[in-house]
Amino acid sequence: MPAAIVHSADPSSTSILVEVEGMKCAGCVAAVERRLQQTAGVEAVSVNLITRLAKVDYDAALIEDPTVLTTEITGLGFRAQLRQDDNPLTLPIAEIPPLQQQRLQLAIAAFLLIVSSWGHLGHWLDHPLPGTDQLWFHALLATWALLGPGRSILQAGWQGLRCGAPNMNSLVLLGTGSAYLASLVALLWPQLGWVCFFDEPVMLLGFILLGRTLEEQARFRSQAALQNLLALQPETTQLLTAPSSIAPQDLLEAPAQIWPVAQLRAGDYVQVLPGDRIPVDGCIVAGQSTLDTAMLTGEPLPQPCQVGDRVCAGTLNLSHRLVIRAEQTGSQTRLAAIVRCVAEAQQRKAPVQRFADAIAGRFVYGVCAIAALTFGFWATLGSRWWPQVLQQPLPGLLIHAPHHGMEMAHPHSHSPLLLALTLAISVLVVACPCALGLATPTAILVATGLAAEQGILVRGGDVLEQLARIKHFVFDKTGTLTQGQFELIEIQPLADVDPDRLLQWAAALEADSRHPLATALQTAAQAANLAPIAASDRQQVPGLGVSGTCDGRSLRLGNPTWVQVATAKLPTGSAAATSIWLADDQQLLACFWLQDQPRPEAAEVVQALRSRGATVQILSGDRQTTAVALAQQLGLESETVVAEVLPEDKAAAIAALQSQGDAVAMIGDGINDAPALATAAVGISLAAGSDIAQDSAGLLLSRDRLDSVLVAWNLSQMGLRTIRQNLTWALGYNVVMLPLAAGAFLPAYGLALTPAIAGACMAVSSLAVVSNSLLLRYWFRRSLNHSVSV
């Protein structure tokens, strides 16, 4: 199966996804990115710790075989393979180690911890089990813990050290290995007078495995939205094998066979029973029913459908059997596009993550340096300057007396080396680059998933962060603030031509156009039962109009300046109506007056934005009087309107606003909005808009409702706040815990950490970041119920 390769506009530039297994912290991410960026031909790299994916842009002329990328990653000690499928509906959400295996390792570690602790408890209760109070027994338990449940962690840590890319696992290896080796030396050479603490590796690995198991479960829950989307795609369907030989009226009862959805092709006929989900985008050829389309449109009520209606994959058939002719299947369906958009959004990094990446890239080296300095200081100067610390057992530290096999709270008065080693180990294991690495991607993962549930498709974490900072919203008028469903209210002939013929010419010029004004003219011609006529040499100029030839006449249809009748005396109409002018080479022929209505939610959305301190403007190609009339209906001042603007001027207007220091969000739907959408800091397109507008936007509102703008803005601000909370926690944790573990508070307050307690703190730190990101779901849903609905 070919790898999932996407070619860009540049024929030599290619993007590919690489699945990377074994990354545990931001240090791992930094190591993979650094190694790939050093590979000749690689142009850009983005690695996501949560999804375990690396997106690599490379020059295909320099890298003919992309497997060299996986070889580079494997050289760091990680498992890597090219993603083998580009259909987002058939892909796993993330390469997460099987929880069943992880739980088994945790269970073994917990058993070893209980047995180890039982030896101590039995001694305290004067009922020790035979042998459990002996050093060799605890040495055996520690060995089992290292070679059993802790083996994968230690192997990954060693690979990182060996390849010059130390990571979180490397810190655990150094910490547990140091404790184990020191205890082993004390056991084998008791004459040295060292003490043993074999329990520390057992307790440390137990806490780390517990934290990672809980963390993986939390990560899995953080992808709930993507899981829900994937669940909408059925695995099998009922395929009609010979539909061409079946009469249309018999299709509903025709025999069908179970068929994998992944093998469906355009043109196939499928039967969809009540209670089944539709597997393809297509057209109903037999039957009528009701559909649950809430997944795509947000409409809570069932929608009726009949022959000729188009349906989308993932929608639920509620009442009667349907036969559907497939038009788009697999990765071409609208559902697949939504899943792909969400997955790509979760892969793209937010700018705020660069800060965490800059720290995490060298974090492990810094921790190792601090641990070495801690050991050297307390083994020499520290114990001399503050000898009283040698009389204080570290809280929670249980040490074995080497000569008697008995446990005791052992003072450190004769062993500065033991104190130094214990504190150095604590430094190694308390440090948490995982929290730094998880702070941003987990929040983005949850936020983009929540957005998808609300019908908001976000292109990436960078878009989400930028939207949170927006304070200036610019709306297109037609089809955005208005419903885009124009009605022809008057034809005003300005030459001796029959009005019906004028309408036929206008409809012919606008044939095949999706613009709302064009649709209104075509609808009016059909309603008048006017026969369609052909137009030749049609040429559309976005934002101005269309030209062509009808009945031998060279015609222009559009705004008055473009049809070159600016010097003519133009008739006036309703201030709220929109005019389209028709002219030939000689004269102005007609004026068509059309009227649109504001969206029902438009006024409330505009006022809600303004009440929260945002500036709202209207940017329209329509005439000034029409745009101002709409603004007044929405409660806006006429000064907020910029009208009669060409598409390129829209982009210039957005650029001018942003040059004043304002980050601007542009909301539009048409071809003429595409330049402005691309120029704005955040472009927002409605689902009913043109493909060009959607491609130019950073956000797509698939439910085609303006109140989704409010929802997206609110969610982006909550997401950015969660990211800042996570980063503050991750940085604050390390700033506080590293000095505590290094013994900075030991002389004055007698406070320090044992390695086991340090390991528990490290596990809790990562879990806290993931849990805080998951809380975003709760706070967001609560906000929907209280302040966002309009």
Swiss-Prot record:
Domain of life: Bacteria
Catalytic residue list: 476
Record bears the keyword Endoplasmic reticulum: no
Catalytic activity field: Cu(+)(in) + ATP + H2O = Cu(+)(out) + ADP + phosphate + H(+)
InterPro entries assigned: ATPase_P-typ_cyto_dom_N (IPR023299), ATPase_P-typ_P_site (IPR018303), ATPase_P-typ_TM_dom_sf (IPR023298), ATPase_P-typ_transduc_dom_A_sf (IPR008250), HAD-like_sf (IPR036412), HAD_sf (IPR023214), Heavy-metal-associated_CS (IPR017969), HMA_dom (IPR006121)
Transmembrane segments: 106-127, 137-156, 164-184, 199-219, 359-381, 421-438, 724-743, 756-774
All ranges on the Cytoplasmic side of the membrane: 1-105, 157-163, 220-358, 439-723, 775-790
UniProt entry tagged with the keyword Transit peptide: no
Subcellular location as annotated: Cell membrane
Signal peptide: none
One Pfam family of this chain: E1-E2_ATPase
GO CC terms in record: plasma membrane
Residues binding Mg(2+): 669, 673
Keywords annotated in UniProt: ATP-binding, Cell membrane, Copper, Copper transport, Ion transport, Magnesium, Membrane, Metal-binding, Nucleotide-binding, Phosphoprotein, Translocase, Transmembrane, Transmembrane helix, Transport
Positions contributing to Cu(+) binding: 25, 28
GO molecular function terms noted in the UniProt entry: ATP binding; ATP hydrolysis activity; copper ion binding; P-type divalent copper transporter activity; P-type monovalent copper transporter activity
Extracellular topological domain residue ranges: 128-136, 185-198, 382-420, 744-755
Protein's job: Involved in copper transport.
PANTHER family: ATP7, ISOFORM B (PTHR43520), P-TYPE CU(+) TRANSPORTER (PTHR43520:SF8)
Annotated family: Belongs to the cation transport ATPase (P-type) (TC 3.A.3) family. Type IB subfamily.
Protein name, as recorded: Probable copper-transporting ATPase SynA
Species: Synechococcus elongatus (strain ATCC 33912 / PCC 7942 / FACHB-805) (Anacystis nidulans R2)
